[in-house]
Amino acid sequence: MIRAEQFSRLVQLREKQWPRFIILALIGFVVHLPSLQGQLVWDDSFLVRDNPFIKSPLFIFEAFRHYLFLDFYSAHYRPVQNLSFIADYFVWNGNLYGFHLTNLLLHIASGLLLYLLLGKLFSSLRGVEADNGNSSAWSLGAFFVALLWIVHPVHSAAVDYISGRADSLAFFFACAGWLLFIRARKSILLAARTALYSFAALSGLLALCSREIAFVWILLFLLHLTFFEKGLSRRAFFITVLCNIGLLGIYAGLRTLPEVLVSTTPSQGWPASMRAVLMLRSLGDYARLMVFPVNLHMERSVLAPENYLSHDQWRHSAGVEYLSILGLAFLGALIYGAFRAGPSRGLRIFGASWFLLGYLPISNLIELNATVAEHWLYLPSVGFLIFAIGCVLDLPVRYRGVLAGCACSAVVALGVSSTIRSSDWLTDEIFYRRTLAAGGRSSRVLANLGQACANRGEYAKAEAILRNVLRLSADYPIARRNLAEVLLREGHKKEAEELLTSTTKAAERTRKEYPLTWVAVLSLALSHHREKDDTKALAIAEKARHDYPGVWEIIRFESEVLRQTRGANAAIPLVDAFAHDNWWHYGAAIALGRLYAEKGDLPRAEAALRHASWLDVHDAEALSLIAAISLRQNRFEEAYRAQCRAVARQPDQPRQYVLLSNILEKMGRIGEARDALAEVALLKALGRDAPALAN
């Protein structure tokens, strides 16, 4: 009797949802724990540190008027990713722990929503004869799909890499939208149903604005409604389809807001036969990664002609050729599983359809910036796991205990692999070295590793690495520019200038293939400026400004040289024009305020600086300059208010308290001035003690 009661309680506990939610969240958090200590890696510098559109809530609407990258050829329209960065920056300032925490929470939340969604969908996919109406096995199957998906290491670049969160955002909002639609259908009250449908549509739009792959979510949604959903009237179906078409129309309209991006990157021009081979190779690689996720790294490729340059490289390429066979075999397995009869056939068909729909955009059918990438499996992997669970559920009941144990073992193995992979993103140097060691030998990775060595002062290592990059890609402008900077540091001035000159001359040709070619041109101008040859420096900068319109770094350099040689009046028109065209640019507003202050036009200086203070909610430079201007005019109360705001934004910076103390002293508040100086002494003492505590 006692055993029967215990068994009954165990069954009841298994049927409850909250223990499963806790397990999913806890395991998902633990396996990615190392990523919380991660620093800026790769594109994080552009999207987090230097991104002007995340520094203030004022840019919530402006984010929809720009592509994700300002100075690149990629037309990634992902404003919601920038909105998430705005929230992170507002809460965490520059603390990267918070950015990584958001990534992790988004992934966990996506996994929880996936479990809820699959629980709803599986009921429509289960045959009448499946488990004799017993849904517990199917519910457990949905749980294991979500759990395996959460811990799978192929998602590392979407979770552990700050810039990779677009996958999680799109997944989260798409899942939420689907669940809201299901809930709306069950609602009785018209107002509640209308609100839920509206929120579902909004979630769908946010998913599309997070990442383009959300279009596949809409196809999956319509596929399920068409072939699997029961009880939906024809009228409701057509209304739903029209609403989705309208949603895509709104998204298409939003994509017209950014300036038209003319991509000059040459097409690969692959013939259809080659694309077919690459599709099979990538399919084989993705299937292998789902089952045996080893040797994980960025810059993957199933097309590497350089692998045939030596015998060892040829042997490596033989493995790539076998991927085509594996891809063909996996495709055959999907087709066979979809047609094989059984109670779980609907589940297998839906899983195979999910995977193939998610795979087609990343299959090399259309040209992308790579032939294969692990994080592209973020959505298709769900279909793979659904298909696998569909195969398992058709096995005899007596095998399910063993299979559940195997699934738990897989969770442990995948979780350990995810934890190890998560540690690859701790620092930029660790990331680049491990990527190279795992086989991701691209010029970009090598160039970034060389720059990381140069930043640490290891110029000999940096030079060797960058010269190796140029042996692989002789025209790579960033590597050429970085090598020139290293050579200057080493005292090889003549070779550095020759390298910068040749890179600048080649820019007209290389800019069609590479972004940021203006960096080498600017470095050459800076080199002439250092040599006091400002006439030559200005000539180079002026030409660069016309060749690369709208690049602030070029305008900033030219205006600074003009200020030094001809005064503030000569520099103001350049900066003023840029600031007028780009109201959101903090650096331009600060520079304009400084120039007006130097000219003596204090009202305009203060207006520009006040505008700048709204563009970055954590930077205090504009407020401190306003305080200094007010202090100079003996407007002590205004200076005090501005500097108090500066201190509130940067309470850990001694210089802010020094200026505050000066203002208080001028106001006759001697005691408060001394308190401010005492805070300076305390902060300096803490700064001296911090290294000792760290050691």
Segments the model singles out, each with a brief description of its role:
Residues 1-491, 501, 506, 512, ...:
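Polytopic membrane enzymes that build or remodel cell-surface glycoconjugates and lipids
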Residues 2-14, 320, 429-695:
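C-terminal luminal/periplasmic domains and tails of membrane-associated envelope-modifying transferases
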